[in-house]
C-alpha cells in the first residue's frame, strides 16, 4: 500500500515538475506585510508521538508551484542547481536498491515547510544557547517518530552533506563557499525557531500560571476582608447586647430597692401596732382576773374598739408614706392580728410562754382563772334552767287559777310578760323584779291552803321565792321574784 502511494506521489511530481526530495535549504520568502518586522523560517518541532498518523498524511501535501518557483528564483546560488542530473541518478539508484526508500526520503523531505515567525532581540540573544539542544532534539524526534518506515536505510547516507558533495564536484565547492554564510544563517534560523516557539509557549504558560496565582490571591484577600467585616459586625452586635443587658440589670436593681423600701416602711409600722395590741392584751387579762363574771365582755369590746381606732389612726398618719404595695400588706397584717387576738382570747393564750422553772406558778394562776370561768358558765346554765322551771311553775299556777280568774287579769299578765321580755332584750344585764298582786279569787284559793307554809328553794342561787304567812291565817301573799336576765347580744 505504501509503495503504491509513493509511486503515485513520484508520478504526480514528475508530471507537475515538482521536486520535493532534494531540498536542503529553504528560500527566503519575503512576506508582504505592512509592518516592517523581520520574519524568519522555522522548522516545526514535533514532539507528540500520538500524532504520527496525522503527520504521515500531512507529509504528502503538495507545495504550490508558484511558491516553489519564487523560492528557487530568489535563491540564485542553490547547491543543487547544477547537479540535477546527479541527484536524479542518485534517486534512481536508491529506488532500485530499495523500493520503499524513495517514499521514505520524499516523506522525510516533504516535512520541511517554510514558516514565518517575527524576530525580536530576545530571540537573538537566546539563539546561541538553544542551537545544540534544538538540533539534537530535532534529529532524535525525526528518527523516533516513524521507526517502522526506515527499513534499515540510514537517511544520512541517502542525503549528501555539503562536504561530500563538494568533494565529488569542484564547482559545488565554490558555490557552497559563497553560500555558506547564508545557509548557516538559514539553519540557525530553522533551529532557533523551535526553541523560540518553546520559549513562547513556556512564557505563555508561566504568564497563565502567574495570572491564576494572582487571581487566587485576590480572591483570598477578598474572603479575608469579608470575614473581618463579619467579625466587626458581630463585635458591634455583642457590644449592643451587653449594653441592653446592663440597662435591664440596673432597672431590676432599682425595682428591688423600691420593693425593699416599701416593705421596710410597712415593717416599721408593725411594731407600733404590736405594742398597742400587747398593752390591750395585758389590760384585758388583768380585767378578766378581777371581774371574771361580767367584765370580760366589756373589756373585749373595748379592746376591739381600741384596736380599730389605732388602726384608723395609723392609716390616717401613714397615708402619705404608704404605696400601692404597702396597703394590701397592711390589710393582711390587720386581718391576721384580729384573728390571732380572737384565738388567743378564746384559748387563753394571753400570756407568753415561760421557762420550765415557772410552770408551777403559772399553772396555779391558770387553775384559778379556769375555775372562775367554769363557775361563770355554770351560773349561766343554772340561770337559764331556773327561768325555765319558773315558767313551768307559773304555767301550772295559771292553769289552776284560769278557771276563776277574770279575763282582764290574764291580759294584764300577758302584757307584763311582754314588757319584761322587751326590757331583757334592751339591757345587757338586768335584774328583773315582778310583783304579782293576786285578786280576790286567788286569795280565796290560797286561804283554802292555809296552815301550810312552803318555802321553795330552787337549784339556782340567784332565784328565791319568799312566802309570808300571818299568825292569824288571814294574810296576803306577795311573791317577789328575783331573776337574772340572759345576756342580750
UniProtKB/Swiss-Prot annotation:
It is found in: Cytoplasm. Residues 1-199, 263-321, 344-370, 391-413, 439-477 are annotated as: Disordered. Residues 182-197 have a biased composition (Low complexity). Residues 468-477 have a biased composition (Acidic residues). Belongs to the TDA11 family. InterPro entries: Tda11 (IPR031388). Residues 210-266 form a coiled coil. Its main location: cytoplasm. Residues 19-35, 90-103, 128-147, 156-167, 263-281, 396-411 have a biased composition (Polar residues). It comes from the Eukaryota. GO terms for cellular component: cytoplasm. Residues 447-460 have a biased composition (Basic residues). Keywords: Coiled coil, Cytoplasm. Residues 73-89 have a biased composition (Basic and acidic residues). The lineage of its organism: Eukaryota, Fungi, Dikarya, Ascomycota, Saccharomycotina. This is Topoisomerase I damage affected protein 11. It comes from Candida glabrata (strain ATCC 2001 / BCRC 20586 / JCM 3761 / NBRC 0622 / NRRL Y-65 / CBS 138) (Yeast).
Amino acid at each position: 500500500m505504501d509503495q503504491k502511494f509513493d509511486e503515485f506521489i513520484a508520478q504526480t511530481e514528475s508530471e507537475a515538475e515538482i521536486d520535493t526530495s532534494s531540498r536542503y535549504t529553504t528560500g527566503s520568502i519575503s512576506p508582504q506585510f505592512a509592518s516592517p518586522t523581520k520574519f524568519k523560517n522555522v522548522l516545526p518541532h514535533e514532539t507528540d508521538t500520538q500524532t504520527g498518523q496525522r503527520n504521515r498524511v500531512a507529509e504528502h501535501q503538495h507545495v504550490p508551484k508558484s511558491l516553489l518557483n519564487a523560492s528557487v528564483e530568489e535563491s540564485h546560488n542553490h547547491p543543487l542547481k547544477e547537479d540535477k542530473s546527479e541527484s536524479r541518478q542518485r534517486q534512481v539508484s536508491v529506488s532500485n536498491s530499495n523500493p520503499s526508500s524513495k517514499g521514505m526520503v520524499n516523506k522525510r523531505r516533504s516535512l520541511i515547510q517554510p514558516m514565518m515567525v517575527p524576530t525580536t532581540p530576545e530571540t537573538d540573544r537566546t539563539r546561541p544557547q538553544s542551537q545544540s539542544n534544538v538540533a539534537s532534539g530535532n534529529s532524535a524526534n525525526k528518527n523516533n517518530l516513524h521507526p517502522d518506515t526506515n527499513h534499515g536505510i540510514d537517511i544520512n547516507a541517502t542525503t549528501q552533506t555539503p562536504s561530500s558533495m563538494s568533494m565529488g564536484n569542484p564547482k559545488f565547492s565554490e558555490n557552497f563557499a559563497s553560500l555558506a554564510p547564508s545557509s548557516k544563517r538559514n539553519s540557525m534560523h530553522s533551529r532557533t525557531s523551535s526553541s523560540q516557539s518553546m520559549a513562547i509557549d513556556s512564557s505563555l504558560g508561566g504568564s497563565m500560571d502567574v495570572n491564576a496565582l494572582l487571581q487566587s490571591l485576590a480572591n483570598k484577600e477578598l474572603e479575608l476582608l469579608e470575614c473581618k467585616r463579619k467579625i466587626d459586625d458581630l463585635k458591634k452586635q455583642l457590644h449592643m447586647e451587653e449594653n441592653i443587658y446592663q440597662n435591664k440589670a440596673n432597672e431590676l436593681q432599682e425595682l428591688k430597692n423600691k420593693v425593699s423600701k416599701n416593705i421596710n416602711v410597712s415593717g416599721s409600722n408593725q411594731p407600733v401596732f404590736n405594742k398597742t395590741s400587747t398593752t390591750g392584751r395585758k389590760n384585758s387579762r388583768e380585767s378578766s382576773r378581777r371581774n371574771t363574771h361580767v367584765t370580760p365582755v366589756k373589756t373585749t369590746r373595748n379592746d376591739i374598739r381600741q384596736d380599730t381606732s389605732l388602726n384608723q389612726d395609723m392609716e390616717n398618719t401613714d397615708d402619705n408614706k404608704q404605696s400601692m404595695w404597702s396597703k394590701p400588706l397592711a390589710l393582711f397584717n390587720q386581718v391576721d392580728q384580729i384573728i390571732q387576738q380572737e384565738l388567743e382570747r378564746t384559748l387563753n393564750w394571753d400570756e407568753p410562754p415561760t421557762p420550765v422553772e415557772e410552770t408551777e406558778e403559772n399553772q396555779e394562776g391558770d387553775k384559778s382563772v379556769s375555775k372562775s370561768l367554769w363557775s361563770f358558765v355554770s351560773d349561766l346554765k343554772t340561770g337559764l334552767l331556773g327561768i325555765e322551771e319558773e315558767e313551768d311553775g307559773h304555767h301550772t299556777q295559771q292553769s289552776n287559777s284560769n278557771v276563776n280568774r277574770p279575763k282582764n287579769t290574764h291580759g294584764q299578765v300577758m302584757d307584763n310578760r311582754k314588757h319584761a321580755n322587751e326590757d331583757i332584750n334592751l339591757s345587757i344585764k338586768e335584774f328583773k323584779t315582778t310583783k304579782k298582786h293576786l285578786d280576790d279569787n286567788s286569795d280565796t284559793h290560797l286561804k283554802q291552803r292555809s296552815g301550810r307554809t312552803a318555802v321553795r328553794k330552787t337549784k339556782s342561787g340567784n332565784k328565791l321565792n319568799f312566802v309570808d304567812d300571818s299568825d292569824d291565817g288571814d294574810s296576803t301573799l306577795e311573791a317577789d321574784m328575783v331573776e337574772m336576765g340572759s345576756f342580750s347580744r
